[in-house]
Amino acid sequence: MLIHWYPGHMHKAQREIREIIHKIDVFIEVLDARLPDSSTNPLLEEIREGKPCLKVLSKADLADPDITQAWQRALEKIEGVKTLAITTQQPGIAKQIPDIVKSMVPHRGMPGKPVRSMIMGIPNVGKSTLINTLLGRKIAKVGNEPAVTKRQQKILID
């Protein structure tokens, strides 16, 4: 007997991402700074098709700063991505994300040509908190249980 473990919502999300991949300029993957390797989506590399990626290590205040920096260096060197460690106590750090993303695709950062990013990550890594921080208001529902946000949303961030 062969048992498959691949929840339907994950399959649906992957299919939806593949349908809009051609519209995405930069991927923003949110990881938990306490366990970056365990909180990454192993399918992201395949899904993003070589497009630029910013890996945001959230909850950095709960992780060892030296280990977080080591993870950032490793991710940047091995995966060729940019990284940023953020905390909810210092929202100014997260507010750098739009400028970082624009620098990753300079041809899209011109007036009238917005950068189209996709924020993604496994449940409970801080995606909704990051969106709320970037917008400066609560637009994405936040909870301490997985799958509070169950669908893709289009949100304009300056």
Model-derived regions, located:
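N-terminal accessory targeting/assembly segments
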Residues: M1-E49, I139
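Charged, alpha-helix-enriched surfaces in structured cytosolic catalytic cores
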Residues: W5-G8, K12-R15, E19-H22, S39, ...
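Switch I (effector-binding) loop of TRAFAC-class P-loop GTPase G-domains
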Residues: H9-Q14, P36, L135-D158
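Conserved catalytic network of the ASCE P-loop NTPase/AAA+ motor domain
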Residues: R18-H22, E45-E49, G109-P111, T149, ...
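Conserved, well-folded catalytic cores of nucleic-acid-processing
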Residues: I20, R34, I47, I78, ...
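Residue-level signature of catalytic and energy-coupling elements of molecular machines
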Residues: D32, L75, L130
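Canonical P-loop GTPase G-domain recognition
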Residues: L54, A60-G121, I139
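Glycine-rich phosphate-binding P-loop
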Residues: S117-V142
